[in-house]
Amino acid sequence: MKLLWQVTVHHHTWNAILLPFVYLTAQVWILCAAIAAAASAGPQNCPSVCSCSNQFSKVVCTRRGLSEVPQGIPSNTRYLNLMENNIQMIQADTFRHLHHLEVLQLGRNSIRQIEVGAFNGLASLNTLELFDNWLTVIPSGAFEYLSKLRELWLRNNPIESIPSYAFNRVPSLMRLDLGELKKLEYISEGAFEGLFNLKYLNLGMCNIKDMPNLTPLVGLEELEMSGNHFPEIRPGSFHGLSSLKKLWVMNSQVSLIERNAFDGLASLVELNLAHNNLSSLPHDLFTPLRYLVELHLHHNPWNCDCDILWLAWWLREYIPTNSTCCGRCHAPMHMRGRYLVEVDQASFQCSAPFIMDAPRDLNISEGRMAELKCRTPPMSSVKWLLPNGTVLSHASRHPRISVLNDGTLNFSHVLLSDTGVYTCMVTNVAGNSNASAYLNVSTAELNTSNYSFFTTVTVETTEISPEDTTRKYKPVPTTSTGYQPAYTTSTTVLIQTTRVPKQVAVPATDTTDKMQTSLDEVMKTTKIIIGCFVAVTLLAAAMLIVFYKLRKRHQQRSTVTAARTVEIIQVDEDIPAATSAAATAAPSGVSGEGAVVLPTIHDHINYNTYKPAHGAHWTENSLGNSLHPTVTTISEPYIIQTHTKDKVQETQI
């Protein structure tokens, strides 16, 4: 213990001696470093083309005709103004030594290019002004390491597009001015990704026709969209801008604002829709804007009819002190010039809204998506009453149930607890209309198909009990399986008890038999149709073949008939006695009873149809007929011997 105490005392003694020495050494080194830095920096001088003030912390070089950034700018400069010169390019490391610079003004020059690394070293830069130059692209690479940049001005540059992640290197931005980009043609969906600290955005006079995606700007408070071309403002245009307080959409040719278009702007305080083409607004359009106190609707051609009455009432209640803010009636003629707040219901005869497409009862299985439609006039408002008494509108926030823009009630997935009656409530200035539908959610067990059928399953069981001879029916409801969008039913199981000795039979009737029977009937009908078709086809083919053969035979007969001449001569049975001698001398040599000798053939004018042609010579045959020299013989006629009572015919060919 004594040794330990001596070591401890010795250690404290050395600490007491060394600590003052270390402290004095550090002070000397700091003093030497300061002297060396002052010596290396030399005297602070202001560039000859600039004017300096506040001990060189403010340097102004405007309107000096500079074509580049001047050299020799003091290193302790906090404010540097180079506006209205002819600077065309900013090279890398131009401002590297200006570590304390907070404001850099380069507007109204001719800058066309900014190199990557042009703003290196500006760790303290707060504001960068590049408006009124000739930039065609956003110099995203030059914004690297500007960790404290709060304001960026790029207005009035011929920038053609804003790509994705154009400003993700400067997440500290709070004000971004992109106004008057008259050459702008495209804004990417992810153009403003990473700007979660942005408070002010100017996109006015950029020739924008569709609202860009502003969802990443969760902290945006002021939005300038005036001077563009928006024919209509749709729901979701300002999605995600729950912190927005001021919205300007002036002189943008807006002619239609759909209902629920401003539902997401819960923090909006000021809204300016002046100098547009609005003639009416949907019922209760401003109801979700609970903090709205300043509204500008003047210089619009308002049509003062039943659809404008709700706006007149709303203005009188929420903005009673400023009747000139919201314009005058443009139509009808007897209302022209009257302030909107002066319009009352006595001037019109209005009717309650009608529901064009009412919701229908729906049976659906658990876990599926569902919709209950309720299509209504565009200038009315739609709300839904749930079975538990909750009222939902488009602006409501529910984890699974939402009201779509067209009034449809949408379920991302249904639960058994969603079963009940849902009522669609449509309202306008004259009244309201309601339509209800029943949603039945069943369990998703045995869900093997998208649709279920109307089925009744009967289960018959038996008990062996002599005393129980009566049948008992006990209906047991079970849930329907499957999913059917509009028409389905629950399955009913009937348990039937009968007395059958020592037998257990469980017959079940399912829709499979019915489906099989229907399928057999369809197949039978199909076979009959096919058989009829085949029979008709074969009959037509047979008729075609017969017709072809008859036609061919007819053609052959016509050819043969045209090539021959048939001459029939009738010979009487009784021959005169005077001719018997001649018959004996006939060259045929036919004799005996029943022989007939043909008479001598002489030339007859009626039978001889051959005429001698010019220069032709004729000969005579054995019959004495004149023939052409080429014909020297002629077949002798046939002698046909028949019964005495028959007639003899001679055929000469």
Swiss-Prot record:
Extracellular-facing ranges: 39-527
Domain (LRRCT): residue spans on this chain: 300-352
Residue ranges of domain LRRNT in the record: 39-75
Tissue: Specifically expressed in brain.
Glycan-carrying positions: N277, N322, N363, N388, N410, N434, N440, N447, N450
Post-translational modification, as annotated: N-glycosylated.
Start-end of each LRR repeat: 76-97, 100-121, 124-145, 148-169, 172-194, 197-218, 219-240, 243-264, 267-288
InterPro entries: Cys-rich_flank_reg_C, Ig-like_dom, Ig-like_dom_sf, Ig-like_fold, Ig_I-set, Ig_sub, Ig_sub2, Leu-rich_rpt
GO cellular component: dendritic spine; excitatory synapse; glutamatergic synapse; plasma membrane; postsynaptic density membrane; Schaffer collateral - CA1 synapse
Subunit text: Interacts with DLG4. Interacts (via LRR repeats) with NTNG2. Forms a complex with DLG4 and with NMDA receptors.
Residues annotated as signal peptide: 1-38
Membrane-spanning residues: 528-548
Main location class: membrane
GO biological process entries: excitatory synapse assembly; modulation of chemical synaptic transmission; postsynaptic density protein 95 clustering; synaptic membrane adhesion
Subcellular location: Membrane; Postsynaptic cell membrane
Domain comment as written in the entry: The last 4 C-terminal residues bind to the first 2 PDZ domains of DLG4.
Domain of life (superkingdom): Eukaryota
Record topological domains on the Cytoplasmic side: 549-653
SS bond list: C46-C52, C50-C61, C304-C329, C306-C350, C374-C424
Pfam families reported for this sequence: I-set, LRR_8
Protein name: Leucine-rich repeat-containing protein 4
The Ig-like domain, residue ranges: 353-442
Keyword line: Cell membrane, Disulfide bond, Glycoprotein, Immunoglobulin domain, Leucine-rich repeat, Membrane, Postsynaptic cell membrane, Repeat, Signal, Synapse, Transmembrane, Transmembrane helix
Its biological purpose: Synaptic adhesion protein. Regulates the formation of exitatory synapses through the recruitment of pre-and-postsynaptic proteins. Organize the lamina/pathway-specific differentiation of dendrites. Plays an important role for auditory synaptic responses. Involved in the suppression of glioma.
Topology in membrane: Single-pass type I membrane protein
Gene this chain is encoded by: LRRC4
